[in-house]
Regions:
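Cofactor- and metal-binding active-site motifs of prokaryotic enzymes
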Residues: 74-140
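Start-of-domain marker
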Residues: 20-101
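Generic local-structure boundary detector
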Residues: 10-17, 50, 67, 71, ...
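Generic hydrophobic, helix-prone segments enriched in Leu/Val/Ile
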Residues: 3, 16, 37, 86, ...
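Bacterial Sec-dependent N-terminal signal peptides
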Residues: 1-25
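C-terminal/domain-edge helix-coil "capping" segments
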Residues: 20-30, 111-210
Length: 210
């Protein structure tokens, strides 16, 4: 669990360096709040599907309603302006390093012939203008020992949106303050989870590794 927490914290640090969190437009946030959010799940069953559904059902408050679809549905149904989408995206930087993100997207009217490309259950050609908020993730971690971090990601994303709408976040400088808040959240979670992890490890040892 400690490695999962450190991975998540490293992701937030990287995100700060990239200075990319999403929109700074309060009007875009206000419009998005009136939509229904479609939570895009992996194709087929996966640990990610189960954990993101649990996280959304427990913590999603940004829009009044949400529903679940699979990434395969993006290929058969066009994006809709009256919907927002919580999905995984993949970005590649100038040095050809790939990064995966949990991204909230404002739907739009696709142009004729415009196709949504998907790789490893993540959209690879999302128009940057449609991004409302995003956080870097490690797909393997959030599908394994770091699954509980999805709850934190969902909460932090909504906190960002709330602060943009209220005008507290207006640009890169004010957005960077989020990093301090997230670091405190991860530190607090680590204090709670690490003792529990030690207890479980001791129990497994006593039980012969079961």
């Amino acid at each position: 669990m400690r490695s999962a927490l450190l991975t998540a914290l490293s992701a937030i640090t990287f995100l700060s360096a990239q200075a990319q969190y999403g929109t700074f437009d309060p009007k875009a946030i206000a419009t998005a709040k009136t939509t229904t959010t479609l939570i895009v799940l992996d194709a087929g069953d996966s640990p990610y599907n189960r954990t993101i559904q649990e996280a959304v059902k427990a913590h999603w408050k940004f829009t009044k309603s949400f529903d679940f679809i699979t990434v395969n549905d993006l290929a058969t149904a066009p994006m809709m302006p009256e919907k927002t989408y919580l999905l995984k995206t993949k970005k590649t930087d100038a040095e050809k390093h790939d990064g995966y993100f949990l991204t909230l997207v404002q739907g739009w009217k696709q142009k004729k012939g415009e196709v949504i490309n998907v790789e490893n259950n993540a959209v690879t050609n999302l128009p940057p203008a449609q991004e409302l908020a995003f956080l870097m993730i490690d797909p393997a971690t959030v599908s394994g020992t770091g699954a509980p971090m999805l709850n934190v990601y969902v909460k932090c994303m909504q906190d960002y949106l709330k602060q943009v709408e209220s005008g507290k976040i207006k640009d890169k400088a004010t957005a960077d303050r989020i990093v301090d808040i997230l670091e405190e959240s991860f530190a607090a979670m680590e204090m709670v989870m690490l003792p529990r992890e030690a207890e479980l490890a001791a129990a497994r040892a006593e039980g012969g590794g079961a």
